[in-house]
Protein backbone atom coordinates (compact mmCIF):
# COMPACT_ATOMS: atom_id res chain seq x y z
CA UNK A 1 0.00 0.00 0.00
CA UNK A 2 1.76 3.12 -1.23
CA UNK A 3 1.93 5.96 1.25
CA UNK A 4 1.31 3.68 4.21
CA UNK A 5 3.55 3.56 7.27
CA UNK A 6 3.39 -0.20 7.40
CA UNK A 7 3.28 -3.07 4.95
CA UNK A 8 1.76 -6.51 5.35
CA UNK A 9 3.41 -9.37 3.50
CA UNK A 10 2.48 -13.04 3.19
CA UNK A 11 3.88 -15.22 5.97
CA UNK A 12 7.51 -16.16 5.34
CA UNK A 13 9.48 -18.19 4.52
CA UNK A 14 7.36 -19.21 1.55
CA UNK A 15 10.14 -20.43 -0.74
CA UNK A 16 7.81 -22.09 -3.25
CA UNK A 17 5.49 -19.09 -3.48
CA UNK A 18 5.91 -15.45 -2.53
CA UNK A 19 9.43 -15.41 -1.06
CA UNK A 20 11.24 -13.89 -4.06
CA UNK A 21 8.57 -11.23 -4.54
CA UNK A 22 8.65 -10.22 -0.86
CA UNK A 23 12.46 -10.21 -0.89
CA UNK A 24 12.43 -7.79 -3.84
CA UNK A 25 9.82 -5.56 -2.19
CA UNK A 26 11.79 -5.41 1.06
CA UNK A 27 14.91 -4.36 -0.84
CA UNK A 28 12.91 -1.59 -2.52
CA UNK A 29 11.54 -0.38 0.81
CA UNK A 30 14.95 -0.44 2.47
CA UNK A 31 16.50 1.49 -0.43
CA UNK A 32 13.75 4.10 -0.21
CA UNK A 33 13.68 4.50 3.57
CA UNK A 34 17.40 3.91 4.20
CA UNK A 35 16.83 2.91 7.84
CA UNK A 36 19.51 3.27 10.48
CA UNK A 37 18.69 -0.26 11.61
CA UNK A 38 16.22 -3.08 11.04
CA UNK A 39 14.43 -4.65 14.01
CA UNK A 40 13.24 -8.21 13.37
CA UNK A 41 10.52 -8.83 15.94
CA UNK A 42 10.47 -12.56 15.18
CA UNK A 43 13.93 -13.61 14.09
CA UNK A 44 15.63 -14.69 12.01
CA UNK A 45 13.55 -13.09 9.27
CA UNK A 46 15.02 -15.11 6.34
CA UNK A 47 16.06 -11.87 4.64
CA UNK A 48 19.35 -9.95 4.53
CA UNK A 49 19.47 -6.19 4.95
CA UNK A 50 22.08 -3.54 4.21
CA UNK A 51 21.31 -1.78 7.50
CA UNK A 52 22.41 -3.34 10.81
CA UNK A 53 19.79 -5.82 12.02
CA UNK A 54 18.67 -6.25 15.62
CA UNK A 55 17.08 -9.66 16.08
CA UNK A 56 14.50 -10.46 18.73
CA UNK A 57 15.27 -14.14 19.22
CA UNK A 58 13.13 -16.41 21.42
CA UNK A 59 13.50 -19.97 20.18
CA UNK A 60 14.62 -22.33 22.96
CA UNK A 61 15.05 -25.27 20.56
CA UNK A 62 17.97 -23.33 19.10
CA UNK A 63 19.52 -21.65 22.14
CA UNK A 64 19.08 -24.11 25.01
CA UNK A 65 17.46 -27.47 24.17
CA UNK A 66 17.84 -30.27 26.72
CA UNK A 67 17.69 -34.06 26.86
CA UNK A 68 14.18 -34.07 28.32
CA UNK A 69 12.75 -32.00 25.47
CA UNK A 70 14.58 -34.08 22.87
CA UNK A 71 13.27 -37.29 24.45
CA UNK A 72 9.65 -36.53 23.55
CA UNK A 73 10.38 -36.21 19.82
CA UNK A 74 10.11 -38.98 17.26
CA UNK A 75 13.18 -39.83 15.18
CA UNK A 76 11.73 -37.87 12.26
CA UNK A 77 11.08 -34.85 14.48
CA UNK A 78 14.60 -35.02 15.92
CA UNK A 79 16.10 -34.90 12.43
CA UNK A 80 13.78 -32.04 11.44
CA UNK A 81 14.58 -30.00 14.56
CA UNK A 82 18.31 -30.65 14.20
CA UNK A 83 18.39 -29.40 10.60
CA UNK A 84 16.06 -26.52 11.43
CA UNK A 85 18.32 -25.43 14.29
CA UNK A 86 21.41 -25.57 12.09
CA UNK A 87 19.77 -23.20 9.63
CA UNK A 88 18.56 -20.89 12.39
CA UNK A 89 22.07 -20.68 13.83
CA UNK A 90 23.50 -19.90 10.40
CA UNK A 91 21.11 -17.00 9.93
CA UNK A 92 21.61 -15.69 13.47
CA UNK A 93 25.27 -15.08 12.68
CA UNK A 94 24.25 -12.42 10.15
CA UNK A 95 23.31 -10.11 13.03
CA UNK A 96 25.43 -8.64 15.81
CA UNK A 97 22.77 -7.36 18.21
CA UNK A 98 19.92 -9.26 19.83
CA UNK A 99 16.97 -8.86 22.16
CA UNK A 100 15.56 -11.79 24.13
CA UNK A 101 13.55 -12.50 27.28
CA UNK A 102 15.85 -14.34 29.70
CA UNK A 103 19.50 -14.69 30.64
CA UNK A 104 19.26 -18.40 29.84
CA UNK A 105 18.40 -17.60 26.23
CA UNK A 106 20.92 -14.74 26.11
CA UNK A 107 23.74 -17.09 27.08
CA UNK A 108 22.70 -19.43 24.28
CA UNK A 109 22.73 -16.58 21.76
CA UNK A 110 26.22 -15.53 22.83
CA UNK A 111 27.46 -19.12 22.62
CA UNK A 112 26.05 -19.61 19.12
CA UNK A 113 27.03 -16.28 17.59
CA UNK A 114 30.21 -15.49 19.49
CA UNK A 115 28.85 -12.02 20.26
CA UNK A 116 29.78 -10.41 23.60
CA UNK A 117 27.10 -10.27 26.31
CA UNK A 118 26.64 -6.52 25.90
CA UNK A 119 25.33 -7.17 22.39
CA UNK A 120 22.38 -9.13 23.81
CA UNK A 121 19.72 -7.22 25.74
CA UNK A 122 17.33 -9.08 28.02
CA UNK A 123 13.80 -7.64 28.14
CA UNK A 124 11.62 -9.79 30.38
CA UNK A 125 8.09 -10.87 29.61
CA UNK A 126 5.41 -8.84 31.38
CA UNK A 127 1.95 -9.36 32.76
CA UNK A 128 -0.85 -8.57 30.27
CA UNK A 129 -2.07 -5.06 31.05
CA UNK A 130 -5.69 -6.17 31.30
CA UNK A 131 -4.87 -8.37 34.31
CA UNK A 132 -3.87 -5.31 36.34
CA UNK A 133 -7.37 -3.89 35.90
CA UNK A 134 -9.02 -7.09 37.14
CA UNK A 135 -9.57 -7.90 40.80
CA UNK A 136 -7.31 -10.85 41.66
CA UNK A 137 -9.08 -11.71 44.92
CA UNK A 138 -9.33 -15.51 45.23
CA UNK A 139 -12.76 -17.06 44.69
CA UNK A 140 -13.47 -20.18 46.76
CA UNK A 141 -16.61 -22.01 45.63
CA UNK A 142 -16.17 -25.48 47.14
CA UNK A 143 -13.67 -27.74 48.88
CA UNK A 144 -11.95 -28.79 45.66
CA UNK A 145 -8.24 -28.13 45.13
CA UNK A 146 -8.04 -26.31 41.80
CA UNK A 147 -4.75 -26.34 39.89
CA UNK A 148 -4.16 -24.12 36.86
CA UNK A 149 -2.09 -25.63 34.05
CA UNK A 150 -2.05 -23.05 31.28
CA UNK A 151 -0.18 -22.94 27.99
CA UNK A 152 -0.28 -23.60 24.29
CA UNK A 153 -1.01 -27.17 23.21
CA UNK A 154 2.54 -27.91 22.09
CA UNK A 155 4.46 -31.10 22.80
CA UNK A 156 7.23 -29.50 24.86
CA UNK A 157 4.67 -28.14 27.35
CA UNK A 158 4.43 -31.80 28.47
CA UNK A 159 0.74 -31.67 29.35
CA UNK A 160 0.72 -35.40 28.60
CA UNK A 161 2.00 -35.89 32.15
CA UNK A 162 -1.31 -34.71 33.64
CA UNK A 163 -3.07 -38.13 33.83
CA UNK A 164 -0.05 -39.67 35.57
CA UNK A 165 0.14 -36.73 37.97
CA UNK A 166 -3.54 -37.12 38.85
CA UNK A 167 -3.09 -40.87 39.39
CA UNK A 168 -0.04 -40.31 41.61
CA UNK A 169 -1.97 -37.75 43.66
CA UNK A 170 -4.82 -40.22 43.97
CA UNK A 171 -2.36 -42.84 45.23
CA UNK A 172 -1.16 -40.33 47.83
CA UNK A 173 -4.73 -39.76 49.01
CA UNK A 174 -5.12 -36.34 47.38
CA UNK A 175 -8.39 -36.99 45.60
CA UNK A 176 -10.30 -33.71 45.72
CA UNK A 177 -8.39 -32.03 42.90
CA UNK A 178 -9.29 -30.52 39.57
CA UNK A 179 -6.68 -29.52 37.04
CA UNK A 180 -7.78 -26.67 34.78
CA UNK A 181 -6.34 -26.54 31.25
CA UNK A 182 -6.96 -24.32 28.22
CA UNK A 183 -6.40 -26.70 25.33
CA UNK A 184 -8.54 -26.27 22.17
CA UNK A 185 -11.35 -28.83 22.30
CA UNK A 186 -10.54 -30.25 18.87
CA UNK A 187 -6.85 -30.74 19.67
CA UNK A 188 -5.58 -34.33 19.72
CA UNK A 189 -3.65 -33.64 22.94
CA UNK A 190 -6.76 -33.15 25.08
CA UNK A 191 -8.39 -36.17 23.45
CA UNK A 192 -5.42 -38.31 24.49
CA UNK A 193 -5.42 -36.87 28.01
CA UNK A 194 -9.15 -37.52 28.40
CA UNK A 195 -8.80 -41.07 27.07
CA UNK A 196 -6.01 -41.84 29.55
CA UNK A 197 -7.99 -40.39 32.45
CA UNK A 198 -11.07 -42.36 31.42
CA UNK A 199 -9.01 -45.56 31.46
CA UNK A 200 -7.89 -44.66 34.99
CA UNK A 201 -11.49 -43.84 36.02
CA UNK A 202 -10.34 -40.32 36.90
CA UNK A 203 -12.11 -38.25 34.26
CA UNK A 204 -13.66 -35.93 36.84
CA UNK A 205 -10.24 -34.60 37.89
CA UNK A 206 -9.74 -32.33 34.86
CA UNK A 207 -11.60 -29.33 33.44
CA UNK A 208 -10.75 -28.13 29.95
CA UNK A 209 -11.87 -24.56 29.26
CA UNK A 210 -10.69 -24.47 25.66
CA UNK A 211 -9.57 -21.11 24.29
CA UNK A 212 -10.12 -18.26 26.77
CA UNK A 213 -9.96 -14.51 26.44
CA UNK A 214 -7.60 -12.81 28.89
CA UNK A 215 -10.56 -11.73 31.01
CA UNK A 216 -11.89 -15.29 31.11
CA UNK A 217 -8.41 -16.59 31.92
CA UNK A 218 -8.14 -14.14 34.81
CA UNK A 219 -11.44 -15.40 36.24
CA UNK A 220 -10.18 -18.96 35.93
CA UNK A 221 -6.99 -18.09 37.82
CA UNK A 222 -9.07 -16.50 40.60
CA UNK A 223 -10.82 -19.84 41.11
CA UNK A 224 -7.55 -21.79 41.38
CA UNK A 225 -5.31 -22.24 44.41
CA UNK A 226 -2.16 -23.64 42.76
CA UNK A 227 -0.34 -23.72 39.43
CA UNK A 228 1.41 -26.58 37.63
CA UNK A 229 4.17 -25.93 35.08
CA UNK A 230 5.32 -29.26 33.60
CA UNK A 231 7.05 -27.63 30.61
CA UNK A 232 10.26 -29.13 29.27
CA UNK A 233 11.45 -26.15 27.25
CA UNK A 234 10.79 -22.40 27.41
CA UNK A 235 12.30 -19.01 26.97
CA UNK A 236 9.87 -17.19 29.28
CA UNK A 237 6.43 -18.63 29.91
CA UNK A 238 3.73 -16.02 30.50
CA UNK A 239 2.13 -18.52 32.89
CA UNK A 240 4.86 -17.85 35.45
CA UNK A 241 4.11 -14.13 35.89
CA UNK A 242 0.37 -14.76 35.63
CA UNK A 243 0.47 -17.35 38.42
CA UNK A 244 2.56 -15.05 40.60
CA UNK A 245 0.16 -12.15 40.06
CA UNK A 246 -2.77 -14.30 41.16
CA UNK A 247 -0.71 -15.60 44.11
CA UNK A 248 -0.86 -19.25 43.10
CA UNK A 249 1.92 -21.35 44.65
CA UNK A 250 3.67 -23.16 41.81
CA UNK A 251 5.06 -26.65 41.22
CA UNK A 252 7.38 -26.52 38.21
CA UNK A 253 10.06 -28.48 36.41
CA UNK A 254 13.57 -27.75 37.60
CA UNK A 255 15.21 -25.92 34.71
CA UNK A 256 17.26 -22.72 34.55
CA UNK A 257 14.56 -21.01 32.49
CA UNK A 258 12.09 -21.58 35.35
CA UNK A 259 14.37 -20.92 38.31
CA UNK A 260 15.65 -17.71 36.72
CA UNK A 261 12.13 -16.28 36.83
CA UNK A 262 10.61 -18.04 39.85
CA UNK A 263 13.63 -18.29 42.13
CA UNK A 264 12.71 -19.57 45.60
CA UNK A 265 8.99 -18.81 45.17
CA UNK A 266 8.30 -22.24 43.71
CA UNK A 267 8.60 -25.96 44.47
CA UNK A 268 10.55 -27.79 41.78
CA UNK A 269 10.58 -31.39 40.63
CA UNK A 270 12.57 -33.58 38.25
CA UNK A 271 11.21 -33.16 34.69
CA UNK A 272 8.84 -35.89 33.44
CA UNK A 273 8.62 -37.42 36.94
CA UNK A 274 4.90 -37.43 37.78
CA UNK A 275 5.46 -39.04 41.19
CA UNK A 276 7.92 -36.32 42.20
CA UNK A 277 5.48 -33.63 41.06
CA UNK A 278 2.66 -35.27 43.03
CA UNK A 279 4.81 -35.38 46.16
CA UNK A 280 5.49 -31.66 45.86
CA UNK A 281 1.77 -30.94 45.52
CA UNK A 282 1.00 -33.16 48.50
CA UNK A 283 3.57 -31.22 50.52
CA UNK A 284 2.16 -27.90 49.35
CA UNK A 285 -1.50 -28.74 49.96
CA UNK A 286 -0.77 -29.97 53.49
CA UNK A 287 1.32 -26.98 54.57
CA UNK A 288 -0.56 -23.65 54.73
CA UNK A 289 2.51 -21.92 56.14
CA UNK A 290 4.61 -23.03 53.17
CA UNK A 291 1.93 -21.68 50.83
CA UNK A 292 2.15 -18.26 52.49
CA UNK A 293 5.96 -18.30 52.40
CA UNK A 294 5.94 -18.96 48.65
CA UNK A 295 3.33 -16.27 48.09
CA UNK A 296 5.46 -13.80 50.01
CA UNK A 297 8.50 -14.61 47.89
CA UNK A 298 6.48 -13.92 44.74
CA UNK A 299 6.14 -10.30 45.81
CA UNK A 300 9.88 -9.71 46.09
What are these regions (language model features)?
Residues 4, 191-215:
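Nucleotide-activated donor-binding/catalytic signature segment of Leloir-type glycosyltransferases, i.e.
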Residues 26, 30, 211-212, 219-224:
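Short alpha-helical donor nucleotide-sugar binding micro-motif in glycosyltransferases
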Residues 77-98:
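Membrane-proximal helix-turn-helix segments that form the acceptor-binding/catalytic region
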Residues 139-157, 163-166, 180:
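Conserved donor-binding/catalytic core segment of Leloir-type glycosyltransferases
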Residues 177-194, 210:
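Glycosyltransferase donor-sugar binding loop
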Residues 232:
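Aromatic "clamp/platform" in nucleotide-sugar-dependent glycosyltransferases that forms part
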Residues 249-252:
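Short hydrophobic beta-strand element within catalytic cores of glycosyltransferases
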Residues 267-274, 283-288:
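Conserved acidic donor-binding segment of nucleotide-sugar-dependent glycosyltransferases
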Amino acid sequence: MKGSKYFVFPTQPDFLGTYKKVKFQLREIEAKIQPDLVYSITAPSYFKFHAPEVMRFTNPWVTHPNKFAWSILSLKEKIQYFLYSLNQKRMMKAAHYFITQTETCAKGICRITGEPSDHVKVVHNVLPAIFKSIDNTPIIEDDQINIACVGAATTHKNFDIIPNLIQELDNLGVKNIRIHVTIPFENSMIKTINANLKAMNLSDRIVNHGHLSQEELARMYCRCQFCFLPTLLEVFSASTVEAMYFQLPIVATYFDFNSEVLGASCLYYEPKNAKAAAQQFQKLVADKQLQEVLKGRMLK
